[in-house]
Amino acid sequence: MLFRSPILCYDYGISHAYVDGDVDIPSAQNVVINSKIQHAASTNSIDTLLVQQSMARPFLAALIRRLLEEYKIQVIGCPKTVALMGQMAMTGHEAVTPATEEDWHRQFQAPILAIKMVADLDEALAHIAGHGPCLTAVIATSDYNAAMRFSREVDATAVMVNASSRLNSGDGYGMGPDIGLNLSKVQTRGPIGLEQLTNEKYVAFGAGQLRHPHPVPETYEDAIMLKRA
């Protein structure tokens, strides 16, 4: 006899982070690093990083160096990102692999990060809308209006303002352990009223909050092990 059992399961979703032109650079770097590296295989680690083009040299170049050399993350990027790091490769640093169109639609759940430079918040929102569904959306900004617009317009299960995507979880919200993150918008049975036609989007406002333990560079761990030996 065949029995059918209903199940509740996690579905595919991409997590994005956007770094605005008005931002606290050290805090934003920590948020991005924590969002990707704290547990790279997790569903709420970021897959795509969008950076406002004006922040390429003051923010992005140093961040990519850290991702490649300190944390051993594979970085793939848009042509502008590849060009930026191509100049760095000439000085002895590792290079960035060009991203394909398919890469912007991938949920990696691995130590891989796709990076794209965007002109402004408009382009960032358009990219996220065109490469979904979006599981977690992070914005790093010091601009209140940009934070509010991003939170309002991005279609994601959760928006983290100046906080790590890794905090998008039951225990991150103080609700206790969860079994997954759901992207479905309609889960109702029986009479359908206004309440059944609405769904929730979590918005968390932070000031650089991270999920602990915060990642330690592999080079630092290697040095500690050598010292102990």
Question: Where are each of the predicted segments found?
Answer:
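Conserved C-terminal structural/oligomerization subdomain of aldehyde/semialdehyde dehydrogenase
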Residues: 97-229
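ALDH superfamily catalytic-core signature
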Residues: 1-110, 161
